[in-house]
Amino acid sequence: KYPYIAGMGVYIFKKEILLNLLRWRFPTANDFGSEIIPAAAREINVKAYLFNDYWEDIGTIKSFFEANLALAEQPSKFSFYDASKPMYTSRRNLPPSMISGSKITDSIISHGCFLDKCRVEHSVVGIRSRIGSNVHLKDTVMLGADFYETDAERGDQLAEGKVPIGIGENTSIQNCIIDMN
């Protein structure tokens, strides 16, 4: 089906072998896939696992962006809801997102977000994101936030001339990756 087999960057080593490879055999190597694994395969017993399910190479900013946006397309190459292939992730114990007066199409909205009178098209919105009124996101990957700011903290930030977390009112963003916080 595919003309090549790619390394996914997932490796399992015995601790002693890994330390030996890194400390003594390849102390100046920078990359497992192109340096350490090929050289180690000539010297030690290396096995591969052929993975036939969904996988995307996200080794460049462009491929990271495109792979994230592809998750919002229907039908998507990857299903978050396939009971035969459950997805396990870290528990975050976040509340559901609060969406008020907004229009969202072909997008993924994560947990704990606040969206107020905004428009989100073909975008991925990460955890704890805050999107203000009259905001238009299109073809955007918004990675979210590590923590919440209270309304008082947001007010203090603005009073000090600083920028609070999230997308402020009357903003239009297209074809963009917005980093966390």
UniProtKB/Swiss-Prot annotation:
It catalyses: alpha-D-glucose 1-phosphate + ATP + H(+) = ADP-alpha-D-glucose + diphosphate. The keyword Ribosomal protein does not apply. SUPFAM superfamilies: Nucleotide-diphospho-sugar transferases. Leaves. Disulfide bonds: none annotated. Gene3D superfamilies: Hexapeptide repeat proteins, Spore Coat Polysaccharide Biosynthesis Protein SpsA, Chain A. Pfam families: LbH_GLGC, NTP_transferase. It is an enzyme of class 2 (transferase). Pathway: Glycan biosynthesis; starch biosynthesis. One of its GO terms (biological process) is starch biosynthetic process. InterPro entries: ADP-Glc_PPase (IPR011831), ADP_Glu_pyroP_CS (IPR005836), NTP_transferase_dom (IPR005835), Nucleotide-diphossugar_trans (IPR029044). Its EC number is 2.7.7.27. One of its GO terms (cellular component) is chloroplast. The keyword Chloroplast applies. Highly active without 3'phosphoglycerate, and is only slightly affected by the activator 3'phosphoglycerate and inhibitor orthophosphate. It is found in: Plastid, Chloroplast; Plastid, Amyloplast. Belongs to the bacterial/plant glucose-1-phosphate adenylyltransferase family. This protein plays a role in synthesis of starch. It catalyzes the synthesis of the activated glycosyl donor, ADP-glucose from Glc-1-P and ATP. Heterotetramer. This is Glucose-1-phosphate adenylyltransferase large subunit 2.
